[in-house]
Regions:
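N-terminal transmembrane-helix/juxtamembrane module of multi-pass inner/ER membrane proteins
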Residues: 1-39, 73-101
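Membrane-helix interface segments
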Residues: 23, 38, 53-58, 122-129
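Residue-level signature of the transmembrane alpha-helical core
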Residues: 30, 46, 62, 131-135
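Hydrophobic, aromatic-rich transmembrane alpha-helices
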Residues: 41-52, 114-117, 128
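Interfacial segments of alpha-helical transmembrane regions
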Residues: 44-72
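Transmembrane helix-loop junctions in multipass membrane proteins, especially transporters and channels
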Residues: 53, 81-86, 146, 150
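Alpha-helical transmembrane segments of multi-pass membrane proteins
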Residues: 65-74, 134-137, 141
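Membrane-embedded catalytic cores of phosphoryl/pyrophosphoryl-handling enzymes
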Residues: 92-150
Length: 150
């Protein structure tokens, strides 16, 4: 293995061996599920369109999500074609339904940080919780052994 992959697997195994617990096994999958298909982020953008005070933020969020979809899921994932860590390391039990697309970059994490970035620019009262959620989403993808830290 190359040094980057060795580092990635060491981090993922550290999480699995030292942080994993039944409490996180219960809450991490539902948090990660919120990012499936980007629906929670799309819903947030659409809801914002209904209110004059948040309409511009909703449009900006929607535009960011569309750009992220194009760059992340349609361009980078097939270009980089990085297999999932659970496919690389033997004997890894995954506690969610295994994704079948490539690992890099994480669509869940990309969308969460797109939303958080727009919201931080527009109103920190919403941006800070969105940023915390984005970091939580990134952690869930590592915890579930479906993405690499790099």
């Amino acid at each position: 293995m190359n040094p980057i992959v060795e580092f990635d697997i060491a981090v993922l195994n550290f999480i699995r061996e030292h942080i994993s617990c039944s409490f996180l096994d219960a809450i991490v999958p539902p948090i990660s599920f919120l990012g499936n298909g980007g629906w929670i982020f799309i819903l947030a953008a659409v809801i914002m369109l209904f209110f004059r005070s948040t309409r511009k933020t909703g449009l900006m969020t929607g535009a960011a999500l569309i750009c992220g979809l194009i760059v992340c899921n349609l361009a980078l994932k097939p270009l980089v074609a990085r297999i999932r860590p659970f496919d690389l390391v033997e004997g890894i039990d995954v506690i969610i339904k295994k994704p079948h697309d490539y690992s890099f970059p994480s669509g869940h994490t990309t969308a969460a940080f797109e939303l958080a970035t727009v919201w931080m620019m527009r109103d920190r009262r919403f941006g800070i919780p969105a940023l915390v959620f984005a970091f939580a989403m990134a952690f869930t993808r590592l915890y579930l052994y479906v993405h690499y830290p790099t």
